[in-house]
Amino acid sequence: MIISASTDYRAAAKAKLPPFLFHYIDGGSYGEHTLRRNTDDLADIALRQRVLSDMSELSLETELFGEKMALPIALSPVGLTGMYARRGEVQAAQAAEAKGIPFTLSTVSVCPIEEVAPSIHRPIWFQLYVLKDRGFMKNVLERAKAAGVKNLVFTVDMPVPGARYRDMHSGMSGPNAAMRRVLQAMAHPSWAWDVGLLGKPHDLGNISKYRGSPTKLEDYIGWLGANFDPSISWKDLEWIRDFWDGPMIIKGILDTEDAKDAVRFGADGIVVSNHGGRQLDGVLSTVQALPAIADAVKGDLKILVDSGIRTGLDVVRMLALGADCTMLGRSFIYALAAQGRAGVENLLDLYEKEMRVAMTLTGAKSIAELSRDSLVKR
């Protein structure tokens, strides 16, 4: 398959992956309306073309939480990344480091912190949920500190798991799920050999380290459902703020009042996110939510944004609307599944090229020069 655009990786991943894995990353919650709006609403944002601006000196570099970045992009935390490529979290982290951007490790990764962090020189970011088992939370935070993690991404939009109907149909969950997954793996021998056999162990590495026994894929859905805490409030985050002395980023903000609460709480950053359309269907797309949030808290903390970002043009749109940085989830997983580390590096090259074209033709010589003046007002 010829890869000429960042969006080509989705089809490449679909061809290579067993359906239960492809649809797990590709799908959203309920009717997937928000999933579609994330991309459709972004595509509807018109860029304002400007010419004859001498764009010979153009820079995509930025700085976030004292960390220099070659691109205003970070790789998002994605659960089970190690099921999409052999030791997938390690490969993705190495690709991110090679391109000069951060990688964020998920709580529910296959590869544990102790495997991923030493695989690169750049400090990884770590993502954590609020869970009922506070002992696990303290344990994993201590391990993250010991591994040199500086930035903590705290996900707050999963007090309960979203209803993801595709997972029932694809074999990730539902009747006879284990047998269906085995049959699907047999029909995809390349994945079965490279990841299914050579990529073992397939457990939730961060959780297994704490429990002292493997937490297998079969236990994944049940563990999530049993440990997410619907009683979560800002007060529950206070002990983590006291315990964690590095930058703390609150992920899952869609409302201006929540953004203001994050400022009052003392967060260093927020991620404007609807979890890629995987939690509450029918909420705003992130590109719809971002402008009001930027108007409310820009300058008080750093604003990151994810969900629906599929091209370098989308990155430019989000930055013009007030984001300081973007985060990629699905798109890097598609590339990782298709071509491993090399695929993620190539994906980021494509994003960079697309950004350079967009910024050259909108007259923005740097990330700081992108603003709503870079967009067509409608």
Curated annotation (Swiss-Prot):
The active site is at 275 (proton acceptor). Its cofactor is FMN. Its EC number is 1.1.-.-. Keywords: Cell inner membrane, Cell membrane, Flavoprotein, FMN, Membrane, Oxidoreductase. PROSITE patterns: FMN_HYDROXY_ACID_DH_1, FMN_HYDROXY_ACID_DH_2. It is a peripheral membrane protein. Residues 1-378 form the FMN hydroxy acid dehydrogenase domain. It catalyses: (S)-lactate + A = pyruvate + AH2. Its main location: membrane. GO terms for biological process: aerobic respiration; lactate metabolic process. CDD domains: alpha_hydroxyacid_oxid_FMN. This is L-lactate dehydrogenase. The gene is lldD.
